[in-house]
Amino acid sequence: MLMITSFANPRVAQAFVDYMATQGVILTIQQHNQSDVWLADESQAERVRAELARFLENPADPRYLAASWQAGHTGSGLHYRRYPFFAALRERAGPVTWVMMIACVVVFIAMQILGDQEVMLWLAWPFDPALKFEFWRYFTHALMHFSLMHILFNLLWWWYLGGAVEKRLGSGKLIVITLISALLSGYVQQKFSGPWFGGLSGVVYALMGYVWLRGERDPQSGIYLQRGLIIFALIWIVAGWFDLFGMSMANGAHIAGLAVGLAMAFVDSLNARKRK
């Protein structure tokens, strides 16, 4: 038996299980704090996870509703059907995921109102020896973003990856990954470019590396990242390193973040195997 995912809303879980039944895949639901979805035939895990990704994008798709009607599990008052986008946001994001997203948005708004330089004077990596004991600076550089595309790209990945880690492994694990990767990726980046940088991408790359390798080595963890996405991450790092797009990228933070995530996943998966 392999646990595929968990849903806070049992009726959302049932909708996914009903749909997979129409595709010839039998899933079961076990109720604990959340509705855990389990797969008996582990050879179908790749297919189920691909379908799950599509389901989370739009759980209100008519094919899922039709599957629930066919199975006799539908009914009225399903708010996730009426507001699928916000339901998907709530379904995947835990409190730490939300707090980080809100903090980044608040800082971004402040940068638009006060200007980048004013905010960076308070949040940037220590740019003067006198600031080295302002410990928040070693982490708050991750909250700053310099364009709408920059913040949207990072927060989308943060929600997708950070939410998965928090839902499956707990808020504590997400906090640890975030703090370690922000600290180490920031340290490496300031060696490359000095202290004037910002963005959540170092943490995002750490989450990419962590989710991918942990899923590969410890499928029972319930987190998973398609190999195509980790390949995309590597291509993006190479493109940034050789300046193929003419964009200013925090290449040091990306590489360091990815390395941190892979290392933490390797250690955690080893510990998980020892406990079995």
From Swiss-Prot:
The keyword Membrane is annotated on this UniProt entry: yes
Top enzyme class: hydrolase
Annotated catalysed reactions: Cleaves type-1 transmembrane domains using a catalytic dyad composed of serine and histidine that are contributed by different transmembrane domains
Keywords annotated in UniProt: Cell inner membrane, Cell membrane, Hydrolase, Membrane, Protease, Serine protease, Transmembrane, Transmembrane helix
Pfam families: Rhomboid (PF01694), Rhomboid_N (PF12122)
PANTHER family: RHOMBOID PROTEASE GLPG (PTHR43066:SF26), RHOMBOID-RELATED PROTEIN (PTHR43066)
Function: Rhomboid-type serine protease that catalyzes intramembrane proteolysis.
Entry protein name: Rhomboid protease GlpG
Organism: Shigella dysenteriae serotype 1 (strain Sd197)
